[in-house]
Structures are given as structure tokens and as C-alpha cells.
């Protein structure tokens, strides 16, 4: 590929294999690809892969922790000694759940959750809301840094928690189903529902849909499941839901900062 740049001197074999697998697909042969310095093997696809896929999007490439990022809060010239740091550690461990833990009660309402196209597919939405203000696991962290001018900064690194994973998994599975030929099935299903409602035959819709699905014959996608992509209206729905996950992730970091500052 002529339009490929790698900003890393060393790449592990598994990551290199994942890059080659993706670039060997006809759907991506003309894409502009950049491999970031933090490149490493991921689940199903390489981490650090950046590309212009045109009108396509691969949810699995975007990843499951949608909106993962950092929040920087200025603490001014506040003095941090052993006592203060111990207090900070106690506050974080007491009031900011980590790992798979969430708050016992909701810290804030996140009304945008119901605006997700895939909202009805989510599991335990009440628990999702209770995860706002939680750290999670992996490489997520909370720390205090000191700048050259002596200013202290509270740094919070976390993302959209289980919401991002559920949304990513739903849309990657949808991408696979569509590439199995179900886009035609879904279009026919929508038309069937509209036609039956217009004809006053609502009671027959369920059985008609079952018959439609029974007669469906899937095709084998040319791409691995992890690299199937979305286009058209499904791409737009995913991007819409991804933006909501990004807002969720941002509010998660803000809530953590508020919790810490309120107890210090």
C-alpha cells in the first residue's frame, strides 16, 4: 500500500499480522492509513490504527471504550504533602468505584441515553447510569501531576464504561449481519410492517415477520466478522450513538472530578 505510514520503530508480530489482515481486504485497499506510535495488538483488530475509510466505518476499529480520554483539572499551587496525598487516596478509594463496580445510587441523570438508536438493545440501563462517576479498570487512572511552574493538576483517565462496549458490540454485530445480506431482510421487514399497518392487519404482523425471517438465506461475508463495516443509514446511526457515548464518557470524568473535589 502506497498511502501507508507507520509512526513506530518496533511493532509486535501479532499487531503486524492484524495490520496486514486489514490492509489485505479489497474494501480498504485505497484508504489513507496511519499507524500510531502506541500500536499494539487488540481484540480482533490492531490498536493505533487510523484511516480514512470514506463512507465506511468499522465499530470494532473505533473500539469498545468509546470516548475514552483524559480530564485535566487545575488545582493551582495547592500543597500536596504525605497527609494530603493519603487523604486523596482515601477519598478516591471510598467515593470513586473502580473495576466493574458502580455507585449504589445514580449521581446524575443522563437523559441522552434514551436518544440512542440502539437504546432498546442495551442491558441494565439503570446500572449504566450508576456507572457515571466511576473509574473502571485496565489502564484507567487518577493522579495529581505537577507542572514546571509548580501548578498542580488532577488528571482523570477513563471512558464510557460498559455503555461504550455495549454500543460497539451491537453495531459490530449489526455490520456482520448486514454483510450477511440482512440489509435486504430489514428493508423488506420495514415495508411489511408499513403495508400491514396501512391495510389494518396489525395482528398479522408478527407471524408475517416470522415467515419472512424463516425464508431468509444468509450469505458468507468476504470480510472477517471483526472487520465488517457499516454504510449508509446504519453508519449514520452508529455515529449518532457514538457521539452520545462520547458525551457520557466526558460526564463520567467530570463527575469523578466533582466527587473528589467535594470530599477534599
Segments (PLM) and residue ranges:
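Glycine-rich, flexible loop motifs
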Residues: 1-33, 53-61, 66-149, 165-264
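Short glycine-rich or small-residue beta-strand-to-loop segments that form or flank ligand, phosphate
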Residues: 34, 153-157
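An anion-binding catalytic pocket shared by soluble metabolic enzymes
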Residues: 41-52, 57-58
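Short acidic, Gly/Ser-rich segments with clustered Asp/Glu that frequently serve as metal-coordination loops
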Residues: 41-42, 69, 159-164
